Amino acid sequence: MQPLTTLAEDERLLRDSVYEFADKEIRPLVREMDEHAKFAPALIDKLFALGVMGIEIPESYGGGGASFFHSVLAVEALSRVDPSIGVMVDVQNTLVINALLRWGSDEVKQRYLPKMATNLIGAYALSEAGSGSDAFALTTRAAECDGEWRLTGRKLWITNGNEAGLFIVFANVNPEAGYRGITAFLVERGFPGFSVGKKEDKLGIRASSTCELLFEDCRVPKANVLGEVGKGYKVAIETLNEGRIGIGAQMIGLAQGALDHTIAYTRERKQFGKAIGEFQAVQHQIARAATDIEAARLLVYNAARLRDAKLPFLTEAAMCKIFSSEVAERTASLAVNLFGGNGFVKEYPVEKLYRDAKIGQIYEGTSNLQLQTIAKNIMG
């Protein structure tokens, strides 16, 4: 029996190679990308070349043919250096590509998956101004007209909105039917009536774009319905469950990165004639953080392996997301504390991680909603 955090050889090689790439190619650009709130374009090309943007796409479509667990390892390794990069790769794989693999027709898969393995970024458009946690209260509408669909509405908080060329958009074709009218559509950036609006100026994960999407009688071919008409709620629920594991991976990567910086700093920073890492109080705080991270990693890895084994993982996904998000915030806060004044300035890396950590308790299902999910599943 293999322990949860003991990786197979191919898993270890993937994690190490992705982290090596992140350390060499991403780390020198982190501060600049954060300040300008924009990814370096050349870096996106390198991520495609590395293979992480289509890691789960079958080899027959030009992808890596790897497992969901492999994508989780990649997100963790990238987020250890920059959680903004981690979430871009996460949305691409755990939300968009997974939805295409599960619900896309053969024609849809052939049309989009080879591009998503090479140069096409995806986004997932569910949230609206009045439907955040209450996702199925969405007001974007779709109506049949002249042999196609016409979408009208507005989406908010859409990750990858600035870079994406393909969007999974949820709209209601029959509002009287409630959530049973919700349908998932594949919208290309160039479709008539579609535009990307305001880009949000965020507290953290600033390089990752978060945008408004506008649909003004947007024309969508009938072939671009993902799954069945009226079954979009199922697409949304099931992909978000997987996405929560991806956010858990992002958060443990962030926490590990913060701890890495903290250990290195406390070995070098001297007060009262010795390194502050020699003081027992500091050592105990670091030991507790390391314990938290390992516990969070166990939860994330367990949820991911359950998903790959086709076993129920809804409760475990909620558990791993809420706990990993809390651990990330605690660890980043500890890093700022132990860096002292240096932790409060942009010259040092931990203030950014502190800002980045907060989003983990908000997106892809707030912590309160995760608690509700866990309670419902264990209490009935």
Predicted ranges, named:
Residues M1-V91, W103-V108, T118-N119, G132-A135, ...:
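Alpha-helical interface subdomain recognition
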Residues G51, V75-S79, A171, V187-P192, ...:
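Short Ser/Thr-interspersed hydrophobic loop/turn segments at strand-loop and sheet-helix junctions
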Residues L95-R102:
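Helix-loop "lid/cap" segments that line or gate small-molecule binding pockets
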Residues T118-S127:
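A short, Trp-centered hydrophobic/proline-enriched beta-strand micro-motif
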Residues G130-S133, W157-N160, V173-E176, K202-S209:
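Short Gly/Pro-enriched turn/cap motifs at secondary-structure boundaries
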Residues A137-T139, G190-P221:
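Flexible, small-/acidic-enriched active-site or ligand-binding loops
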Residues E148, T152-V196:
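A short core secondary-structure module
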Residues C211-E238:
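A short, charged helix-loop
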